[in-house]
Amino acid sequence: MYESVDVNPFLMMDYYNQSRGCLIPDKMPHPFSSSIRHQHWSGSNHSIETQSTSSEEIVPSPPSPPPPPRIYKPCFVCQDKSSGYHYGVSACEGCKGFFRRSIQKNMVYTCHREKNCIINKVTRNRCQYCRLQKCLEVGMSKESVRNDRNKKKKEEKKPECTENYTLSPDTEQMIDRVRKAHQETFPSLCQLGKYTTSNSSERRVALDVDLWDKFSELSTKCIIKTVEFAKQLPGFTTLTIADQITLLKAACLDILILRICTRYTPEQDTMTFSDGLTLNRTQMHNAGFGPLTDLVFAFANQLLPLEMDDAETGLLSAICLLCGDRQDLEQADKVDVLQEPLLEALKIYVRNRRPHKPHMFPKMLMKITDLRSISAKGAERVITLKMEIPGSMPPLIQEMLENSEGLESSSGAQGSRASATTPGSCSPSLSPNSAQSSPPTQSP
């Protein structure tokens, strides 16, 4: 047997496997071919080295650095920080929105000086006429606004792939029942004969005793009306008495605030109670609202764009009341079951009433969160009022509102009184059965 070893491309050396003799060239290479063989061998070695080197250099390249953030020139109109190019020029969000609204609504402004007001970040809101003129001077395009508006109109005309929101007979009957319950316990603003009082201070004071007496009287009647409203809701009276009282205490202030805010008149910045008494912001503060006043008026302004009718206000009030996450409920699951059809009814009703505003239903539900936040502060206000009023707090107001959910009772005597009436106790003044026999009253 023979083996061979390749020592260069042209020279072969054989040896006998058994004798292991010396390696002897079979034939000496010809001198003429040595240079060619050397070149070929060298080229072969070079080729191998090149391939080896290239294979070692195949490594992943490092990631490229992120592009630097775009930096725009300051707003051409007011020199504020620009958010990009809008309607042809570099502009801030404020000037962009101002120009768009002015063109879309064909606004006509007037300058109260000499039509040469300085427009900058500080003064841009002082003269709308000069601000609009500067927008046009720096090159903002009216046509761009019109094209943008036409584009949005075309998008609105596209058929929407929406769910089928059809009112079933049962749902329609439920909505009618809740609407009727709301209307019977809370007359609308157009049904009232407004009157005002001139015997109050024109500036904010700690407490106007006369206004407080009137306000506390109306609030007591309103609480009774809230109980009457609750009794008419589907399934409410099937709950245990303890759960009915727990729900009423937890949601009463929510419903009171929601109701009074639907009687807000933005032109006069006033609110009207059910007997027609109309109070402005200062009078509401002095009547007992105190630091709660601005929160309530701000919430009333937020309700205006929703344009809620009686059915929607009644359904939202019912959803606030029948909420299974209240503390100390005996049958929380049953309360949730009662709330579900109310949520579905409100969703279908709102979508049918506003087919092109699909986000209106979740916006309404978000108001429940706002109401709870205001109510928590309202319950605290009831406690501080007891130290400001000359006499005692009306018992129904103290019992219903002071123990609102989430409020920690005060220490000492206040704490003992608060703990005396637990959320599940059957207080005669709060009992839905006692409300049934109460005489007809007006709510604020």
Swiss-Prot record:
Zinc finger (NR C4-type): 75-95, 111-130
Induction behaviour: By retinoic acid in embryos.
Compositional bias of kind Low complexity: 47-58
Tissue: In the embryo, zygotic expression largely overlaps that of rarab, with high levels in hindbrain, lateral mesoderm and tail bud. In the adult, strong expression in brain and muscle, weaker expression in ovary, liver and digestive tract.
GO molecular function annotations of the record: nuclear receptor activity; RNA polymerase II cis-regulatory region sequence-specific DNA binding; zinc ion binding
Known function: Receptor for retinoic acid. Retinoic acid receptors bind as heterodimers to their target response elements in response to their ligands, all-trans or 9-cis retinoic acid, and regulate gene expression in various biological processes. The rar/rxr heterodimers bind to the retinoic acid response elements (RARE) composed of tandem 5'-AGGTCA-3' sites known as DR1-DR5. Required for hindbrain patterning.
Record protein name field: Retinoic acid receptor alpha-A
Gene designation: raraa
